[in-house]
């Protein structure tokens, strides 16, 4: 039985980290694509040469030709311009929309049966555009956002409570931006909801509110520290978790930017919601009940995403 083929579109910081993680986990053979000749080939060769030391069996190929992604089982899209200090994810809209058109056409022509995970920002608008440009089924095109945002939330909570991250669960819904909605009521430590932990004196509401805000600002915090780019280790790890759920039919319940058609009262748009990922792609959107305040925050986030979608339509009139 042939190993799965995983195409990574974009050989920047996230793309290179993805290639390394996929090889280490032996999820499949890697094709690293980029338009900058030499970069994907050099990174693929460097990672491949670590194989004898790290003891993984995986083929890695760098390329500038979309034909090399032919038949890929999974495509992870990181191509585009990263954030720099002072930029919001939304500032990237015009530049990265053109990139999504090119990538969508390349995937449609060469890997139409792939499960496509988009990481390019502004995420919710880019995955929506990518699905239209590629024409792939909506359940096979998804955005990586909630897994990363929830991981950041979990990290901050584990630090605050001085407990293992393995015992912390957290949910972040909504758009991948300043309006994201970390749900404290659905987040737990070993099954104990965060509001109960506040009542038990483990933390204060003020500290919890600060953690929620730090989660919203998580990407910007790293951009500000790095000064020359944006996060790449945690985004890559988050996308690999999604790819693994698909390839191994794990039926993981993960928050992702998924297509909504009636769920949460939304129609014909992508936004961060709880999903089940298995061999069918996004097999289910889990329509959880939101409280009044949670719904108001979620609606605000949805409206921000809709604004980006309208801006995209103004740039490219082929989008509907």
Swiss-Prot record:
The active site is at residue 176. It comes from the Bacteria. Keywords: NAD, Oxidoreductase, Tricarboxylic acid cycle. InterPro entries: L-lactate/malate_DH, Lactate/malate_DH_C, Lactate/malate_DH_N, Lactate_DH/Glyco_Ohase_4_C, Malate_DH_type3, NAD(P)-bd_dom_sf. One of its GO terms (molecular function) is L-lactate dehydrogenase activity. It catalyses: (S)-malate + NAD(+) = oxaloacetate + NADH + H(+). Its EC number is 1.1.1.37. SUPFAM superfamilies: LDH C-terminal domain-like, NAD(P)-binding Rossmann-fold domains. This is Malate dehydrogenase. It comes from Dinoroseobacter shibae (strain DSM 16493 / NCIMB 14021 / DFL 12). The lineage of its organism: Bacteria, Pseudomonadati, Pseudomonadota, Alphaproteobacteria, Rhodobacterales.
